[in-house]
Amino acid sequence: IFLFIEKMNKSSVFFQCFGCFKAKNKKDPVSSCFLMYGKNKFLKNEALVLSDCGVLENPDADTLASIASQSVKSAQAFGLEPRVAFLSYSSKGSAKSDAVDKVRTAYEKFKKKEKDIVCDGELQFDAAMVPSVAETKAKDSPLKGNANVLIYPDLQAGNICYKTMQYVGELNAIGPILQGLKKPVNDLSRGCSVNDIVVVSAITALQCEDKEEKKGE
């Protein structure tokens, strides 16, 4: 099921989606992720998953951990081996505040639940993405500056970052891809290209196929 409504803002689209298709699990949030890809020296021909850049404005630690779990599943569906970084303006205690504590707590909850996933937090963007910086700021991090699933502390940070990557970093941004609904439903930015529409349509079709396969198991 693919939903694209011209000239509607995201709030209107999401309101319609959530009215028609309920959450998969009442305990888990409905969130979103973006798939970022393109030629970039930091990506090394690999894509990134960014979350949540489109739905939840200010998730608490429990919700942030759930968003990360949903994003891991999305990354795996895209063929990635997820390496999750919980992002902050602090790296491993370099700053102290309630905002930093939220990110650190979310990481700890996620790590306890997803024992087989390589992850770390709280980390600054460069400590999560640049190996040479990680050696200084997060020497013992299992990510070693090679994260490919980036979990942002709130919607403002996530949305600003994906658009910066898209326009300044010249990466392709696919999404928001909705996570946590009973049926596959996705949205597109009003500034999307024809290629964006094609790719999101293909992703949504794959999500439908995945659900059908699970029904048959």
What is the predicted function of each stretch?
Residues 1-217:
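Anion-binding alpha/beta catalytic cores of soluble intermediary-metabolism enzymes, centered on
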